[in-house]
Design a protein with these regions (language model features):
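Secretome/extracellular-domain signature
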Residues: 1-89
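Extracytoplasmic/periplasmic beta-strand context in beta-sandwich domains
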Residues: 33-35, 111, 138
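A C-terminal functional module that forms or caps the active site or interfaces directly
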Residues: 93-105
Length: 144
């Protein structure tokens, strides 16, 4: 969150980061894109999940803000465990709300702006590589 002094007619560049793209199978996810306002205030995209082995993965770290008067970090995604518990991780939350939940046959897309997508699991152990949910796109909120 930041406050900028502007003069009517001033132009500021706005970049809205894309959410991390979905992946299928026991692989690491994709990072989210960075958002920025005027090249001054930045919201870095969240980091991908990290596959440690075929049976577990670490949730990705939340994105880090900089350049604002108040810099709020995004939430970390949940770890996934598949050995005996068969739990996949949910996507990390953002300032705007929660991430996507994990799901059988496919993870759920991030719900709130800037949140992560959930992991997928194969409830029938069929060997099908189901897709994770996409991360939600970032946001740049401006009030005049």
């Amino acid at each position: 969150l930041g406050w900028l002094d502007v003069v009517p007619g001033t132009t500021l560049s706005v970049v809205v980061g894309k959410g991390g793209a979905s992946v299928s199978g026991a692989v690491s996810g994709n990072d989210g894109g960075d958002s920025s306002l005027g090249g001054i205030i930045f919201g870095r995209g969240g980091k991908k999940s990290n596959k440690a082995s075929i049976v577990n993965s670490a949730g990705g770290d939340g994105g880090v803000a900089s350049g604002g008067d108040i810099n709020i970090q995004g939430g970390t995604g949940q770890d996934g465990q598949a050995a005996t518990n068969m739990l996949t991780g949910s996507g990390g939350a953002s300032f705007w709300g929660g991430g996507g939940r994990s799901g059988a046959t496919g993870g759920v897309k991030g719900k709130a702006a800037g949140s992560g997508g959930g992991g997928a699991y194969d409830i029938d152990f069929s060997g099908i590589a189901y897709p994770s949910g996409d991360g939600a796109d970032g946001i740049v909120h401006i009030e005049w």
